[in-house]
Regions:
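Short runs within selected transmembrane alpha-helices of multi-pass transporters and secretion channels
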Residues: 66-69, 73, 136-154, 162-173, ...
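Residue-level signal for transmembrane alpha-helical positions in Major Facilitator Superfamily
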Residues: 19, 31, 35, 68, ...
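Hydrophobic/aromatic residues in alpha-helical transmembrane segments
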Residues: 35, 72-73, 113-114, 149, ...
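Short alpha-helical transmembrane segments in multi-pass integral membrane proteins
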Residues: 1-21, 76-142, 172-175, 179, ...
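Small-residue-rich hydrophobic transmembrane alpha-helices
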Residues: 50-107, 146-157, 161-162, 277-301
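Residue-level hotspots within the lipid-embedded alpha helices of multi-pass solute transporters
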Residues: 25-29, 63, 103, 136-140, ...
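Helix-terminus/linker motif at the lipid-water interface of multi-pass membrane proteins
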Residues: 30-49, 118-123, 179-185, 189-190, ...
């Protein structure tokens, strides 16, 4: 039972944790919309449609590993609350090892798949989607690791770290999308490949900043972070798998329906314009859920 006198304190803690998470998620969703608008302005409606299709497919893959973020956050918050800092660090070290293996498997799998992954009535849309996806693919393994790290910082009550990393990375990402898709002149445009390359480079920047925060001497000493020979254990893996695996399949089933919605939109006669409209609608729906997601994360922590 929560005593009435504890409510203000709990509310302050929920706001302190939940508000940065909500803001960070909103900034990410807004940047996705701006990226698509830049692509559409510089490269046309077909490019917008192709990038929309590939970006949604990428999002399905990435959100499946949101399960790892939730699992890390759940384990770390409990271990941190019990002041078992070594176990909290072991949870992240083990999650990073799991994420590295899963990310490498995804990268290798999709090296052997062609444009047939992106089903559209017009081959031009499928080809543009595949071009974008191939240049964005290296970012997906890195994003799996980033999700684990975000879960760790949420679990120790430091979501502000995520916000401080996301802000400069997303600005750099949009600047690169603008530059690589024709902002510096049509003759220097890389087309949709430039948008995919911008995602990969900005993700590498973000991962580097997160690792820099983890590698600080005080963090490594307290939590034993980034010690993979001794910090990766079966004991740490068991709760991560027990929590994360059901959520993984839940995310796959739930979010694959979003991709199917995009595939259906890609079959109509004016498919490029339809993909534009459906993607914008999906982004607005996503943005509307972000406050609940942020404060739900705070409540779980």
């Amino acid at each position: 039972m929560i005593l009435p006198q504890r409510v203000p304190g709990l509310l302050r803690r929920a706001v302190r944790i939940g508000l940065p998470i909500s803001i960070a998620n909103f900034v990410v969703a807004a940047s996705q919309m701006i990226e698509l608008l830049i692509v559409g302005r510089h490269l046309g409606t077909d490019a917008f449609g192709g990038v929309s299709l590939a970006a949604t497919f990428s999002l399905v893959l990435i959100l499946a590993f949101y399960s790892l973020q939730i699992a890390v956050q759940a384990v770390v918050s409990r271990r941190h609350g019990a002041r078992d800092y070594a176990a909290a660090g072991a949870a992240l070290n083990t999650a990073l090892a799991i994420g590295t293996c899963c990310g490498a498997a995804i990268f290798l799998l999709f090296q052997f798949l062609g444009p047939q992954v992106f089903v559209a009535e017009r081959e031009e849309i499928s080809a543009l989607a595949f071009q974008y996806f191939r240049w964005r693919l290296p970012s997906i393994p890195m994003l799996v690791l980033i999700l684990s790290i975000v879960g760790f910082f949420n679990g120790v009550g430091r979501p502000d770290v995520t916000l401080r990393v996301y802000a400069p990375v997303l600005v750099a990402h949009l600047a690169m999308v603008w530059a690589f898709t024709g902002g510096l002149g049509a003759e220097r445009s890389l087309g949709v490949r430039g948008a995919g390359l911008a995602s990969t480079l900005s993700t590498a920047m973000g991962l580097g900043l997160f690792v820099w925060n983890l590698a600080r001497p005080a963090m490594r000493e307290r939590y034993g972070l980034l010690r993979f020979r001794t910090g990766v254990t079966r004991a740490a893996a068991r709760p991560l798998v027990a929590i994360g695996l059901p959520i993984f399949f839940q995310q796959i089933l739930g979010n694959f329906s979003i991709y199917l919605f995009q595939v259906i939109a890609a079959q109509v006669p004016d498919q490029a314009a339809t993909l534009v409209a459906t993607n914008i609608a999906l982004l607005f729906i996503n943005i509307s859920t972000l406050p609940g997601l942020g404060f739900g994360t705070a409540a779980a922590t």
